[in-house]
Amino acid sequence: MEGIFSHLDGDGSPRMVDVTGKAETARTAVAEGWVTLGGEIAGRLAAGESHKGDVLKIAETAGIMAVKRTPELIPLCHGIRIERVDLKCSFSKTTGRIYITCSVAARDVTGVEMEALTGVSVAALTVYDMCKGISKNMTIEGIRLLSKTGGKSGDYAAGGAEKE
């Protein structure tokens, strides 16, 4: 149902949405987000001076792992069979920003929007964690759903992707 808080019952108590009568369909979702790095962090990342390993690859791995664990992190999120995750972190030396995208696909009774958003969020948090020893001057921003397909509510596409 649109227009209501579907995870609350009539008394306002939390509940998991009943999906028992829904048919499996192909579902996709794409989310994006940014980490803006302070000058010192950006310079050291551009120079490959991380002592903890490849920051972007580790963030990508963390984001993929998070997609698979979304129902453990979001209490009322259904566990679904993830069929594909494509998570990418790209660093712009000119802006000092890391652009993160996460695309998720499944064939199930509920969508994968939360999984895509969780992947981006955890990848961004991993960048922060790996770089905070240099400086806390970082901003995580712009995490949003770019698109989704499948399901009763139909397709969705946000306007104005910000990719650099």
Model-predicted regions and their roles:
Residues 1-56, 61-164:
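C-terminal binding/interaction regions
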